[in-house]
Amino acid sequence: MTFPVEKVRADFPILQREVNGLPLAYLDSAASAQKPNQVIDAESAFYRHGYAAVHRGIHTLSVQATESMENVRKQASRFINARSAEELVFVRGTTEGINLVANSWGTENIRAGDNIIISEMEHHANIVPWQILCERKGAELRVIPLHPDGTLRLETLAALFDDRTRLLAITHVSNVLGTENPLPDMIALARQHGAKVLVDGAQAVMHHAVDVQALDCDFYVFSGHKLYGPTGIGILYVKEALLQEMPPWEGGGSMISTVSLTQGTTWAKAPWRFEAGTPNTGGIIGLGAAIDYVTSLGLDKIGDYEQMLMRYALEQLAQVPDITLYGPAQRLGVIAFNLGKHHAYDVGSFLDNYGIAVRTGHHCAMPLMAWYGVPAMCRASLAMYNTHEEVDRLVAGLTRIHRLLG
């Protein structure tokens, strides 16, 4: 069955607008995806008809809002096949989720002389928290290097592990290269050394189904805004036994059991002990609607369509004069490139004049830019609402830029 891309596009009102007098070609979903009417309407309806502070309220609106919020927790747990909804913590996004793990689990479990393994392709969100933790604890941060094609040099991974390795923190899919890392093999190796595993799933969950039980990872984190949901909301999955042992890292309302000026404070059970303060309930409702939306379309069908579009895009872009494409042939979601010696910012500015939105810069992956020896790259990302015609416009735009700039 053909993927109904035009029907999908009709659900996204922003795709009807023009930029610089031309139809918008939005090729920046890896930074943040656009939102369908179903998400916009669900969040709006909550604020119009159902808003109240959650937890402890006895009135109808509060009870219903709390129930709606917890239903999304259950829904998200099914989405990634967690064993229990109580393994999921609502966070602001992937960055906060990783920082939570670093400041809670990491503070309790990392000692001087221990080491943490990351890769050279990580987003800053999966580098900086571990740098801070290692500096504070006197631990070592070890790095898996890259092959020129943008895949990890897995033959070096075994040598990085030893009996002081406490954590492997790895991206599921690179936000620059689109590389999907072989998590089962990497996690199996970590298990041989008794190390925990954190997976940054920010660039994976919108492209195919994720099964955290099958992966057997300890932590999995993703953001709602890349999954066609609202900003300011994300999910941190932690294996239940591990989560129950972790101390809170933020204090305040809703995360306590009792508070006494003389007897101290006791914590709520997990996951609520990690959700201090008033939550982003509207964002949570919107996230639930986003999960409903992609589930109704079928992640397998979305993935098949996106892969067909990716193959077409790579074939067509390879014909652009003087273009350099970065990353492996088999990839998910993104195509990073440079055009001759022209700065990515200039190329992106020209494309914007043609109504084409791409991302330019270091993509929060400065170590990766350094490895390739470039200050920046352009990045076009492909989502379920993109079309062959938009790819053709990108190719035509780049060909025109090459002709203009030489």
From Swiss-Prot:
Keywords: Cytoplasm, Lyase, Pyridoxal phosphate, Transferase. The keyword Cell inner membrane does not apply. GO terms for molecular function: cysteine desulfurase activity; pyridoxal phosphate binding; selenocysteine lyase activity. The active site is at residue 364. GO terms for biological process: cysteine metabolic process. The keyword DNA-binding does not apply. Its EC number is 2.8.1.7, 4.4.1.16. Its cofactor is pyridoxal 5'-phosphate. The modification N6-(pyridoxal phosphate)lysine is found at residue 226. GO terms for cellular component: cytoplasm. It catalyses: (sulfur carrier)-H + L-cysteine = (sulfur carrier)-SH + L-alanine; L-selenocysteine + AH2 = hydrogenselenide + L-alanine + A + H(+). It is found in: Cytoplasm. Pathway: Cofactor biosynthesis; iron-sulfur cluster biosynthesis. PANTHER family: CYSTEINE DESULFURASE. Belongs to the class-V pyridoxal-phosphate-dependent aminotransferase family. Csd subfamily. Cysteine desulfurases mobilize the sulfur from L-cysteine to yield L-alanine, an essential step in sulfur metabolism for biosynthesis of a variety of sulfur-containing biomolecules. Component of the suf operon, which is activated and required under specific conditions such as oxidative stress and iron limitation. Acts as a potent selenocysteine lyase in vitro, that mobilizes selenium from L-selenocysteine. Selenocysteine lyase activity is however unsure in vivo. Homodimer. Interacts with SufE and the SufBCD complex composed of SufB, SufC and SufD. The interaction with SufE is required to mediate the direct transfer of the sulfur atom from the S-sulfanylcysteine. This is Cysteine desulfurase. It comes from Salmonella dublin (strain CT_02021853).
